[in-house]
């Protein structure tokens, strides 16, 4: 990301084109998420919502992907752990599977990653129901792939019937 941006632009990863300003924008977005988490954990803020670009859930630990240069969500979750939170839950509520977040925490039993997304859309082959984590993190990944065309009701049902019980069990 840094090298491609410093060169004035180009490819920084799979479907991750950048220009001269991209690296700085991505660092500011990731930093905003990290600071928001620190603010909430310290009690300085009751809550935080980070409306940042570029997005992050496709960026993998060692590569940019699909317009995502750094994984803002994964960075925020790691900051929460560094600030002393024993358990962190990440919910991906999107048409796309957040493969980068899943990859970042696949072996971490202290981060529950739940993704509600359209089955088979992007990235191809990612976010299947059989992907549940590995090693010590086995069972810490929960994918809820919905059929194409699923509307609000399907997402809400998945949330109430799958996400809420998983969150309660993880506590």
Indicate where each model-derived feature is located.
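HDAC/HDAC-like amidohydrolase catalytic core signature
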Residues: 1-171
């Amino acid at each position: 990301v840094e090298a491609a941006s410093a060169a004035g632009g180009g490819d920084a990863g799979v479907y991750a084109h950048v220009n001269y300003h991209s690296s700085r924008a991505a660092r500011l977005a990731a930093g905003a998420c990290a600071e928001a988490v620190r603010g909430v954990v310290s009690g300085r803020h009751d809550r935080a919502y980070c409306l940042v670009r570029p997005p992050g859930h496709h960026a993998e630990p060692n590569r940019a992907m699909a317009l995502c240069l750094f994984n803002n969500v994964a960075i925020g979750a790691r900051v929460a752990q560094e600030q002393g939170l024993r358990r962190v839950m990440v919910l991906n509520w999107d048409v796309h599977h957040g493969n980068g977040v899943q990859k970042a925490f696949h072996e971490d039993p202290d981060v529950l990653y739940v993704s509600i997304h359209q089955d088979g859309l992007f990235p191809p082959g990612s976010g299947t129901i059989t992907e549940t984590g590995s090693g010590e993190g086995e069972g810490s990944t929960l994918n809820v792939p919905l059929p194409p065309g699923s509307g609000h009701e399907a997402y809400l049902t998945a949330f109430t019937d799958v996400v809420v019980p998983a969150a309660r069990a993880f506590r």
